[in-house]
Amino acid sequence: MELGLKGKVAMVAASSKGLGFGIAKALAEEGATLSIGSRTKDDIEAAAEQLRKEKNTEVLSSVMDSSNPESILEWTNATIREFGGVDKLVVNAGGPPAGKFEDFSDEDWQAAFELNLFSAVRMIRATLPSMRKRGGGSVLTVTSMAVKEPIDVLILSNVMRSGVTSLIKSLSVQLAADKIRLNNLMPGRIKTCLLYTSPSPRDRG
């Protein structure tokens, strides 16, 4: 399939395994140059090496924490230094812990905000200047089917990912004139390593 991605530079967050890694593989198959980031050095380097061997593509791997603003900027700047700019951004992050409303403190809510909502704001803001300079680009945010039908035990995720969806809807209008396309992916249950650690319907009570 020809999707016009050959030679395009794509940044994919939380991409050492699971859905993020799957997205990176799909982009590589279409000829994109990759900048992948994740928190664990060994995991992200192993993912990069696998992509280079299997997909024969250029890959920059970076240790990156989506909840840390300095880390996001360092990853973006490293990508621009290495490849000259950014064309595609995939905003992805792990989910906050499961639990009921009364289980969570202010600190828990703030941590979920930093990880799942503010990370999207920061990544998009960091890459916008490069996309504008290159005449356009695209952003894909990975949220959850829970933005349509909340999962009762995932209240932190439900709230934050719904916020991301609203952010993308708003920015899709604001950035249309810059030829920057924004879309939101709302996956359901996918057979990745996360599936086996996610709460089942029985666990939700």
Per-region residue spans from a language model:
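Conserved small/polar residues in nucleotide/adenosyl-binding loops
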Residues: 196-205
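Active-site loop-to-helix junction immediately N-terminal to the catalytic Tyr of the SDR YXXXK motif
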Residues: 104, 150-158, 170
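Residue(s) in the substrate-gating loop at a strand-loop-helix junction
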Residues: 144
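Alpha-helical segment proximal to the catalytic Tyr-Lys
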Residues: 129, 173-177
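Substrate-binding pocket helix/loop in short-chain dehydrogenase/reductase
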Residues: 100-101, 108-113, 195
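Conserved glycine-rich cofactor-binding loop
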Residues: 14-18
